[in-house]
């Protein structure tokens, strides 16, 4: 996609004098122009393969898949629309093999097992080496330094392992016990191809996060009319990476690590008041672990924070649904109420970091 759609925006005009200097007329933000985006092309190519077997004595399903992809993305703006780039871009590729195994009646009757595993190795190259400054008309002037935002030609290697285990044990038709465990391991190493440093991170310090989430649940379904379930989860996350010791959050990085853990739980139930009308009620003491970009940024337009706490929330949901079928036709309606009480909420803001012209999305 060229993404060359129109935007309505003001323009930072400039004039180049005969001596080569640049004059900037007063900026009039009341004048809005209808202009095309000109540096926002994106393309992605992928090769995907999958092979497996089903219906074997030792496996009901075993599948191995492979995914290789390449992408190229031009960067039109910073985190603000009035910061315009004309040559900044990023590119990269990723390799992802994965495995899935499913077996019913494992060792004993009514014990089902699902295992999945995948490995993702991707490389991203952020390039900002132009010595030009652009406006929304695509006009430019030569600057005295390189880098439209921040001079860089950096390479980030991300290695990500993920695995899941899920076991279901059925006792008769009414009772089901489920145990699940999800593990992930992420490591990012970065380097500057041109030998430049970054104000927003330390290339020499690896970024590492490891997550483990274990869950146990019980479901009672004595009839098609109603069911209830209860569950508990344990969360654990280890993070390690560069943390700035400066008051403005820029430079003077040291390698710090932290470990957080939490315990969540909840219950849910459904009940048919009559044949076509169902009510659902659920409550969860939930936790959301920070993502890799929230922890470490994207090495370009986003800055992360290694010492983030998990989001915690009390979630209450109540919904009603009506589903009526008559002949080839059907009527479905649903209404619900949602209550959320969230603490340690992770949000992104916009900031000018380190007193520079570089604006970033920050946690």
Residue ranges of predicted features:
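Face-selective signature of the C-terminal outer-membrane beta-barrel domain
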Residues: 48-71, 90-249, 254-274, 280-284, ...
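Membrane-embedded beta-barrel scaffold of Gram-negative outer-membrane proteins
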Residues: 270-284, 288-290, 311-361
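Periplasmic-side early beta-strands and strand-to-turn transitions of outer-membrane beta-barrels
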Residues: 1-80
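Short beta-strand or tight-loop elements
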Residues: 265, 304, 314-316
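Short, solvent-exposed loop/linker segments at the N-terminal edge
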Residues: 207, 309-311
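Short, intrinsically disordered, charge-balanced linker/junction segments flanking boundaries
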Residues: 1-12, 173-174, 335, 352-363
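Outer-membrane beta-barrel translocator domains and adjoining extracellular loop/strand segments
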Residues: 5-13, 74-83, 125-134, 189-198, ...
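Extracytoplasmic loops and strand-loop junctions of Gram-negative outer membrane beta-barrel proteins
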Residues: 27-35, 79-85, 96-97, 143-151, ...
